[in-house]
Amino acid sequence: MGKFCLYFCLIYILFSASSGNPSRCTLFIGASSYHSDPCGSDHPRCTWRLDLFSLTRDQSLSPPCPDLVTYSQYHRPYSLYVFPHWITKPNRRGLGYYSASYSDPCAIQCPYLGCQSWTCPYTGPVSSPHWKYSSDLNFTQEVSSISLHLHFSKCGSSFSFLLDAPGYDPVWFLSSQATQAPPTPAPLIQDSDLQHILEPSIPWSSKILNLILLTLKSSNYSCMVCVDRSSLSSWHVLYDPLKAPNPPDPKAQSILRPSLAIPASNVTPPFPWTHCYRPLLQAISSEHCNNSVVLPPFSLSPLPNVSRPRKRRAVPIAIWLVSALAAGTGIAGGVTGSLSLASSKSLLREVDQDIDHLTQAIVKNHDNILRVAQYAAQNRRGLDLLFWEQGGLCKAIQEQCCFLNISNTHVSVLQERPPLEKRVITGWGLNWDLGLSQWAREALQTGITLLALFLLLIVVGPCVIRQLQALPSRLQHRSQPYSLLNYETNL
């Protein structure tokens, strides 16, 4: 009996642990935290969608190093290439995606003097095991947004992101920790509440207002209107009774008014203001609060009247005749233009060779500039080491720090451009070479010219033949305009 109770308790503990709240991984930067999608041992891939500008603002409020330089003004005009700082120098493929091998991460040391993307100078010893790119951590990045994927077994460590630029790299220091998702309350919206919205006869304005009312009642994570915390600064308050709507279209019906005012206490609002958005829970809570619902402003405008279809009208026969003549002239002009383009192929080859030589010279100069930038960065770090006690070179001379950003995008695009001959002459209609010899090309061109003239003769020939056949009868008619009535009389 005792063994049976022990087995029953173990089964109950395992079942309760497996059916508990889903876990997740939380990133901490400065005083802010970012929760991943639900992940754990069953689903080990934790995913975040991060905004680099928001990370920069969060880190500036509580920087890991006292004299850490903020790079919000530096990297804004450029495309960002971000990767963890323990990666070796990657082979760039495309414009922002990497395939890299991992080395051990480097410890963070203050004051931070900057580092190259592929090295970690002036940092402490190795403190973490080997990580693999494909399974432990990977990401994709588009301009200022990054999608990060981290294995749940690696949650609990600290790492950083760097901007791929020579010299002092913009850096974001992040730490991770496994957390539990808050309990999900029962939904307050029933399926019967959605029938009013799904009816096709209900106007759009009534549907949207009911959708907002149902959203205010929802307090679970499957709410019908999801709020993104990174975009709250650009959204507006739902209702303001002190301002009248002023839509650009007189026929448009203003649903949400862009305002930042709270309804007055003596005015009865059309919505229950007892529901508010909780950033910590990332959901709409039913607790009492004084703020309003945050939604983007928009208005509904009626669709314009569809224009009536135009009636087809008969085209006069003269237009067909003129079109035929124009087609013949166009064929002759097209043949002439194609022949002239074919004769300039040798010129394109010479120009393409000159462009190839210029491209090689530009690439060599670009490599030399990169070497000079590396030498300058090494000298800069050496001067910072000399002025370590004074906070670095820039703080010692009391001048603004200057950074050099060398972009490889334009050089890579220049190298990947196809030859000029392929870009200018691409189709058979403009390329008369076809791998033939000189006499074969001339014979082909002559044959096409004769064919065009023959087609023109077929179009115009029948008209000319009819006119020539009718010419003798017309001349005979003009030679005897009058006939004699009687040869025997003098009348």
From Swiss-Prot:
One of its GO terms (cellular component) is host cell plasma membrane. Keywords: Cleavage on pair of basic residues, Coiled coil, Disulfide bond, Fusion of virus membrane with host cell membrane, Fusion of virus membrane with host membrane, Glycoprotein, Host cell membrane, Host membrane, Host-virus interaction, Lipoprotein, Membrane, Palmitate, Signal, Transmembrane, Transmembrane helix, Viral attachment to host cell, Viral envelope protein, Viral penetration into host cytoplasm, Virion, Virus entry into host cell. It holds the Pfam family TLV_coat. The chain crosses the membrane at residues 445-465. The keyword Acyltransferase does not apply. The mature envelope protein (Env) consists of a trimer of SU-TM heterodimers attached by a labile interchain disulfide bond. A lipid is attached at C463 (S-palmitoyl cysteine). Residues 21-444 are extracellular. Glycans are attached at N138, N220, N290, N305, N405. This is Envelope glycoprotein gp63. The record marks R313, A314 as: Cleavage. InterPro entries: TLV/ENV_coat_polyprotein. GO terms for biological process: fusion of virus membrane with host plasma membrane; symbiont entry into host cell; virion attachment to host cell. Residues 342-388, 398-430 form a coiled coil. A motif (CXXC) lies at residues 223-226. Residues 377-393 are annotated as: Immunosuppression. The surface protein (SU) attaches the virus to the host cell by binding to its receptor. This interaction triggers the refolding of the transmembrane protein (TM) and is thought to activate its fusogenic potential by unmasking its fusion peptide. Fusion occurs at the host cell plasma membrane. The transmembrane protein (TM) acts as a class I viral fusion protein. Under the current model, the protein has at least 3 conformational states: pre-fusion native state, pre-hairpin intermediate state, and post-fusion hairpin state. During viral and target cell membrane fusion, the coiled coil regions (heptad repeats) assume a trimer-of-hairpins structure, positioning the fusion peptide in close proximity to the C-terminal region of the ectodomain. The formation of this structure appears to drive apposition and subsequent fusion of viral and target cell membranes. Residues 314-334 are annotated as: Fusion peptide. It comes from the Viruses. The 17 amino acids long immunosuppressive region is present in many retroviral envelope proteins. Synthetic peptides derived from this relatively conserved sequence inhibit immune function in vitro and in vivo. The keyword ATP-binding does not apply. Residues 1-20 form the signal peptide. A motif (CX6CC) lies at residues 394-402. Residues 466-491 are cytoplasmic. Disulfide bonds join C223-C226, C223-C402, C394-C401.
